[in-house]
């Protein structure tokens, strides 16, 4: 077959495979377009879980008649125009793929009017060439998008849609996340003609807390500690639940936003988890709603098809900043009794971070503050007026754009001089608190496969290769239930000897617990499913080696087989970076807490700084 340019319809459907996963994906893309257009009210109408109808109506700036056809074309956008714009994304959308992708798998109608136009216009694409038809319509200033019969022309995709209740649940969660990101926008959600959610725009702090309680529940609001933490161009705001009152239901509330974009980032989650580790059990998770604002030049949002992940240029800096901000709030909550509302405010300096004091550039005294109220403990790195925004604290809101000349250069964070220590320090600050459920903080990567950690007042080297091996063993070892098996698209069929066949038959119960589904016949073995850690492996090599190992064993212990597989899996990482190391340690700390308490040989090696310093003095 010769190389040829794909037809527009086929190209758009391929792109839709990444952008349009389910009805909730459509809602997310279209609502983000409304927010980028400056809308202050968004109405979302859903029918049959989004399979029948998704209608998004806003009062934004609208689209000009001459641009309606372009709006439905691939890679057509008003968000960016040059490479410089791509390196500093401030809008939620920027690729120009959403409308074209959605229109290729559904019947999409776009109706819009700008303030300059006297009448509205409606556009829709149809036919194999996606030809756009534009005609007059009646509509106020703003835009309405109707998506009918999602996946009507791709039956395979439609077959994988879940029940109406499940799909609407995903839509409800997306709308909830967006409502938490933009307090200044009214969002109404209806399903099958019934109003399900009404999030009204709020401005004052008390109203924000009411909206927070509406979305996250009264239990979260009751134990929420407000954060406002700032250093240079980095700002962290939001709420974290008191770890001492965290319940499994509260732990489901983990919402994180980077420059107003909802995000799932393991680096941020690890920083928060590490800050709460002394107060959380091994099986507990923190609950939080946090907003991180950062120079757009220092974060890459163009790394995930659905823009769910970002990559920080200074990941260690961001990690330590978030860790310090959350930890300081939790320490204040423990060190200072809550004041009654009628009591006069008494200034009190914030204690230094006991774990990072002297070793973290963010650990320096804050300005005097008032005692916390019931809901908020808000240490601020700088006076509110220094942010240049009226009204002190700033919350998610519509911004006209990021100005490069505003704020100090991001790299000044690395050159921030150390603040002088206070004359009086709490006695407990002299001792460095240990990490009860953490290996410590990653300082740097050494040799490509080792992490240098700050741990229990000293330094240690951790082998990332060994840590990954232990993580795989934990993932492969069954607990109360067997490891979940992942079916292979094409089963693997191998020829075996009579001895290997007998060994496989004897080991079959153990293999089933490990998520390996094998079937034998006269001369062959067929592998139909493997556990998730094996999916990316070369099974043509690994499975014969596993069969050879089993043929040499007299007994088949599940733990021994899991250990053998963990040692023989091929690592995807040949050289680690900071973000990968932090994510790996977060998984190991969560799945293998026993390694933190009693590290096995080859995993952790203390670094003797005293001997090195004495050697330098002797010289």
Swiss-Prot record:
SMART domains registered for this protein in UniProt:
DNA_mis_repair, MutL_C
Q: Which GO terms describe its molecular function?
A: ATP binding; ATP hydrolysis activity; ATP-dependent DNA damage sensor activity; mismatched DNA binding
Entry GO CC: mismatch repair complex
Which residue ranges does the record annotate as region Disordered? 339-400
Superkingdom assignment: Bacteria
Q: Which GO terms describe its biological process?
A: mismatch repair
Q: Which UniProt keywords apply?
A: DNA damage, DNA repair
Q: Which Gene3D superfamilies match?
A: 3.30.230.10, Histidine kinase-like ATPase, C-terminal domain, MutL, C-terminal domain, dimerisation subdomain, MutL, C-terminal domain, regulatory subdomain
Checking HAMAP family in the record gives: DNA_mis_repair
Q: Which family does it belong to?
A: Belongs to the DNA mismatch repair MutL/HexB family.
* Functional note: This protein is involved in the repair of mismatches in DNA. It is required for dam-dependent methyl-directed DNA mismatch repair. May act as a 'molecular matchmaker', a protein that promotes the formation of a stable complex between two or more DNA-binding proteins in an ATP-dependent manner without itself being part of a final effector complex.
- Cite the NCBIfam families for this sequence: mutl, PRK00095.1-1
Q: Supply the name of the protein.
A: DNA mismatch repair protein MutL
